[in-house]
Amino acid sequence: MSASLPAYSQPRNAGALGVICTRSFPAVVGTADMMLKSADVTLIGYEKTGSGFCTAIIRGGYADIKLALEAGVATARQFEQYVSSTILPRPQGNLEAVLPISRRLSQEAMATRSHQNVGAIGLIETNGFPALVGAADAMLKSANVKLICYEKTGSGLCTAIVQGTVSNVTVAVEAGMYAAERIGQLNAIMVIPRPLDDLMDSLPEPQSDSEAAQPLQLPLRVREKQPLLELPELERQPIAIEAPRLLAEERQSALELAQETPLAEPLELPNPRDDQ
């Protein structure tokens, strides 16, 4: 007799699970997009296990999962990023302990995110954060795109994700690719036209453009004003001015010196008439 699972752990299309792993986050997103567009499956989410290894998990009927995985494996091998894949028919409910199933189901129940008019998304993965920042800056300056978020997958690998029209995303990814190669090391790029809602829901939620207004925090205690310190008064002392006395003494010395010095006798020049 099998135990009945709670309502939240009875997902739709509970026939099989498909799991595929790649060596790059852009590659796993592109692989997931191909699987969603090739069969009637639901993207549960991703698992990032470090060193750039990323796994996409899909759910649906066994035939749909098999068809989707075949398309996903071919896509990952085309990117040269394929690692492994498997199909789990009739998965048990306790697999949600290691798979992001409950989180995905809660997001489907809320259904608060809207993805209208998403023409394309672009992903650039670099080895090192400075190259990622430079690539994101180049993408935003080269085309009319919006930076959604960024992902870190371990071993220094990080991915920037932008969205916009197909032409703008293509131009932005090309500019970001050159900027990343100039600054550091480029690992992978991806442009996905017309992404489905399941794929957009699997990406991190974008940050709000405007920050929420924060209430003004008034101090709970008002500090008392400290009294000003008074400086002690200094005693006034008379200052003797000796300048006039010194000037008079110098004048008297100059007069005495002039009287003691004899006047020079006049110099007598010879008369030229006496020579005649």
Curated annotation (Swiss-Prot):
<feature type="domain" description="BMC 1">
    <location>
        <begin position="16"/>
        <end position="100"/>
    </location>
</feature>
<comment type="similarity">
    <text>Belongs to the bacterial microcompartments protein family.</text>
</comment>
<feature type="region of interest" description="Disordered">
    <location>
        <begin position="200"/>
        <end position="219"/>
    </location>
</feature>
<dbReference type="GO" id="GO:0031470">
    <property type="term" value="C:carboxysome"/>
</dbReference>
<dbReference type="InterPro" id="IPR044872">
    <property type="entry name" value="CcmK/CsoS1_BMC"/>
</dbReference>
<protein>
    <recommendedName>
        <fullName>Carboxysome assembly protein CcmO</fullName>
    </recommendedName>
</protein>
<dbReference type="InterPro" id="IPR000249">
    <property type="entry name" value="BMC_dom"/>
</dbReference>
<dbReference type="GO" id="GO:0015979">
    <property type="term" value="P:photosynthesis"/>
</dbReference>
<dbReference type="GO" id="GO:0015977">
    <property type="term" value="P:carbon fixation"/>
</dbReference>
<keyword id="KW-0602">Photosynthesis</keyword>
<keyword id="KW-1282">Carboxysome</keyword>
<keyword id="KW-1283">Bacterial microcompartment</keyword>
<dbReference type="GO" id="GO:0043886">
    <property type="term" value="F:structural constituent of carboxysome shell"/>
</dbReference>
<keyword id="KW-0677">Repeat</keyword>
<feature type="region of interest" description="Disordered">
    <location>
        <begin position="252"/>
        <end position="276"/>
    </location>
</feature>
<dbReference type="Pfam" id="PF00936">
    <property type="entry name" value="BMC"/>
</dbReference>
<dbReference type="InterPro" id="IPR050575">
    <property type="entry name" value="BMC_shell"/>
</dbReference>
<feature type="domain" description="BMC 2">
    <location>
        <begin position="120"/>
        <end position="204"/>
    </location>
</feature>
<dbReference type="InterPro" id="IPR020808">
    <property type="entry name" value="Bact_microcomp_CS"/>
</dbReference>
<dbReference type="InterPro" id="IPR037233">
    <property type="entry name" value="CcmK-like_sf"/>
</dbReference>
<comment type="subunit">
    <text>Homooligomerizes, possibly as a trimer, interacts with CcmK2 in the carboxysome.</text>
</comment>
<comment type="function">
    <text>Beta-carboxysome assembly initiates when soluble RuBisCO is condensed into a liquid matrix in a pre-carboxysome by the RbcS-like domains of probably both CcmM58 and CcmM35. CcmN interacts with the N-terminus of CcmM58, and then recruits the CcmK2 major shell protein via CcmN's encapsulation peptide. Shell formation requires CcmK proteins and CcmO. CcmL caps the otherwise elongated carboxysome. Once fully encapsulated carboxysomes are formed, they migrate within the cell probably via interactions with the cytoskeleton.</text>
</comment>
<comment type="function">
    <text>Required for formation of the carboxysome, a polyhedral inclusion where RuBisCO (ribulose bisphosphate carboxylase, rbcL-rbcS) is sequestered. Required for recruitment of major shell protein CcmK2 to the pre-carboxysome. Suggested to be a carboxysome shell protein, but it is not detected in gels, mass spectrometry or by protein sequencing.</text>
</comment>
<keyword id="KW-0120">Carbon dioxide fixation</keyword>
